[in-house]
Amino acid sequence: MSTLEIKTLHAQVVPADENEDPKPILHGVNLTINSGETHAIMGPNGSGKSTLSYAIAGHPRYEITEGEVLLDGENLLDMEVDERARAGLFLAMQYPTEVPGVSMANFLRSSATAVRGEAPKIREWVKEARGAMEELAIDPSFSERSINEGFSGGEKKRHEILQLGLLKPKFAILDETDSGLDVDALRIVSEGINRYQAVSYTHLTLPTT
């Protein structure tokens, strides 16, 4: 059984202007997530939902000033961002970043290699990736496109759920994953999340408004 423990977490937003002071957002957050649990964190805009997500993941604009985040007893705050991912943490952002010049195919296989510790065999990987894309109604041609470049909101979200299914993290933090989705896209994304959780027992934290 895996456990994610957030203990007395304080965090602040680091301003882009170095002449401005950091803005404290989180004040002593405590949360424990055990295997098989789904948690929904609800609150108005500006209440700190995204701050909690990004701070745990290690975003440089969000500085943790006090507390611990333990994944199976290991303090994530002592790890670099890539080490947190390899430890089993996954973040789906509200506004996924576009990465021109890097194809989805290369990104996904490189990410899987980093997380799994070895490169998946080409034939097996192609079968695995195509199957996951089919389940999310992603056109195979998208694998040759640059990451999120020119994607619709629904396509970006499906790409993130595709990553979730292929990387198989211990814990997934989904930041307002329903934002900007129409009814059909929301259904596909929701089914993808439910399907993955049923198979792998991933434990989801869902910041939402």
Task: List the predicted regions and their residue ranges.
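The feature captures the beta-strand-to-loop junction immediately N-terminal to the Walker
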Residues: 42-44
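ABC-family P-loop ATPase nucleotide-binding domains
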Residues: 97-170
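Helical segment within the ABC ATPase nucleotide-binding domain
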Residues: 186-199
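Conserved small/polar residues in nucleotide/adenosyl-binding loops
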Residues: 202-208
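Conserved structural motif at the start of ABC-family nucleotide-binding domains
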Residues: 4, 26-28
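Walker B catalytic motif
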Residues: 176-177, 184
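ABC ATPase NBD Q-loop/coupling interface
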Residues: 68-84, 148
